[in-house]
Amino acid sequence: MPNTALSTAELTDDQVHDILTTALARILRRIDLTQQEMRQIMTIIMDGRCPDAMLGALLTGLNMKSESIDEITASASVMLDFAKKIEPKNRTNMVDIVGTGGDGSNLFNVSTASAFVAAAAGATVAKHGNRGVSSKSGSSDLLEQAGLNLNITPEQTRECIETQGIGFLFAPNHHTAMKHAIPVRRALKVRTIFNILGPLTNPAGVKNLVVGVFTDNMCEPLAHVFKNLGAKHVMVVGSKDRLDEISLATSTKVAELKDGEVTVYDIFPEDAGIDSQTLVGLDVNSSEQSLQLIQAALSGKETNDFGIAQNKVNKARDMIALNAGAAIYVAGLASNFPNGVNQAQNILQSGKALQKMQALAEYTQTFDR
């Protein structure tokens, strides 16, 4: 039974309808809901009592209004109440690196590739992700292509984290109540509050994260949400070219939560000794294409078997180094962002990140499907 302060069990269908319609009317008037109101709405959704048409209207309305800090905090709190959590023993230097999605760029899976680099550098990675909803290659799609068995239990995922230093928390295995929202999200095919909630609801209780957002005006609000939820060291990043990653092409806005304070600043690739470059060639049409580019980049080799131009591979490495460097930094393995990027570059040259990916894939195949 979810440990939630609110329950819909004693509400009649008419009462649920009234709560939902009242909330929708306020949202459409661009009035923010209180945390208590949003907790009740999210509990109704998680209990499967929100009709699809109403859910679509609520998600669209929140998107158009822009979700408030209180609305996001309350929603994340309810999702965590309903989640199947795990508690890995090796929590020192534990990190997640994840994007909200919804940026429409169709880049290769930068955060997933970066996770293997961070793990190879010594971080414990609890990677939370899902299938692509508004992109052509979600992290789960990519990892299945790489040979990972995602049909494992939460406890088996915990075992991966403890033995391999990295595990992939496939959202449907941990957030089973989210099944009620999947049809509507797939039908909408645009970013919703659930894109925002994914990074906030890591079932391993990760306190150090790099989180990419689809628009940089979400950086500071989301950093404050993380503060509300008890996170320790977080970089919320959104680039000027509207990527939910640290961009190789331009400046990236950062809202950094550290020591209980949120600081906002801009970073450039040159800050970490990397030249700015266009993103041409880094977009993909499928998880297969994304995997090929990532394997070539993580291999450390100067040639590849996929027929990919080496300049594209080198560009992908630079993009991965920037984002993995941030993860290494917030995990506590680097004194600052540039030092983290330098560590990431060394890992990329060594080929250890690809070995980490292959080892995790092999380990997950030892579990019964």
From Swiss-Prot:
EC category: transferase
Family, as annotated: Belongs to the anthranilate phosphoribosyltransferase family.
InterPro entries: Anthranilate_Pribosyl_Tfrase, Glycosyl_Trfase_fam3, Glycosyl_Trfase_fam3_N_dom, Glycosyl_Trfase_fam3_N_dom_sf, Nuc_phospho_transferase
Catalytic activity, EC: 2.4.2.18
Residues the record lists as binding anthranilate 2: R185
Keywords, ordered alphabetically: Amino-acid biosynthesis, Aromatic amino acid biosynthesis, Glycosyltransferase, Magnesium, Metal-binding, Transferase, Tryptophan biosynthesis
Example GO molecular function: magnesium ion binding
Pathway(s) per entry: Amino-acid biosynthesis; L-tryptophan biosynthesis; L-tryptophan from chorismate: step 2/5
Residues binding Mg(2+) 2, per UniProt: D244, E245
GO biological process, one term: L-tryptophan biosynthetic process
Residues the record lists as binding 5-phospho-alpha-D-ribose 1-diphosphate: 99, 102-103, 109-112, 127-135, 139
Catalytic activities: N-(5-phospho-beta-D-ribosyl)anthranilate + diphosphate = 5-phospho-alpha-D-ribose 1-diphosphate + anthranilate
UniProt name for this protein: Anthranilate phosphoribosyltransferase
Record keyword Chaperone present: no
Binding site for anthranilate 1: G99, N130
Function: Catalyzes the transfer of the phosphoribosyl group of 5-phosphorylribose-1-pyrophosphate (PRPP) to anthranilate to yield N-(5'-phosphoribosyl)-anthranilate (PRA).
Cofactor binding: number and manner: Binds 2 magnesium ions per monomer.
UniProt binding sites for Mg(2+) 1: S111, E245
Cellular component GO terms, alphabetical: cytosol
Taxonomic superkingdom: Bacteria
Subunit-structure text: Homodimer.
Cofactor: Mg(2+)
